């Protein structure tokens, strides 16, 4: 059985918004709850995430953990045999410098992997140890 004292408002209760700057008796008059001077009292001020009032923030107090190799990792790019067919002539030497000159790879690239997409139409000379051939490309070259 429902009792009268157990009835609840079906809609979520909403707190009435405080009126700011409406006299001293409101508790939010004059400075409107912003205090005197400083950044927070100015218009347009938004506190940066993690800001702790000028003290050293938590993310700088806590020691860093681990180590990332991202800065030191070697940049590796992939090239397909189809692309090599388009770029190089028959009997051409394939090296990192040759690929960089033709702007096929970035300047920072230190290693290239050749992947089989189509059969190589041309006989190419592999000059650089930094160019790694996939198993499919190796078997294709050995067959020719």
Swiss-Prot record:
Gene3D superfamilies: 3.100.10.10. InterPro entries: Ribosomal_uL15, Ribosomal_uL15/eL18_sf, Ribosomal_uL15_bac-type. The keyword RNA-binding applies. GO terms for biological process: translation. SUPFAM superfamilies: Ribosomal proteins L15p and L18e (SSF52080). One of its GO terms (molecular function) is structural constituent of ribosome. One of its GO terms (cellular component) is cytosolic large ribosomal subunit. It comes from the Bacteria. Keywords: Ribonucleoprotein, Ribosomal protein, RNA-binding, rRNA-binding. Residues 1-48 are annotated as: Disordered. The keyword Iron does not apply. Belongs to the universal ribosomal protein uL15 family. Part of the 50S ribosomal subunit. Binds to the 23S rRNA. This is Large ribosomal subunit protein uL15. The gene is rplO.
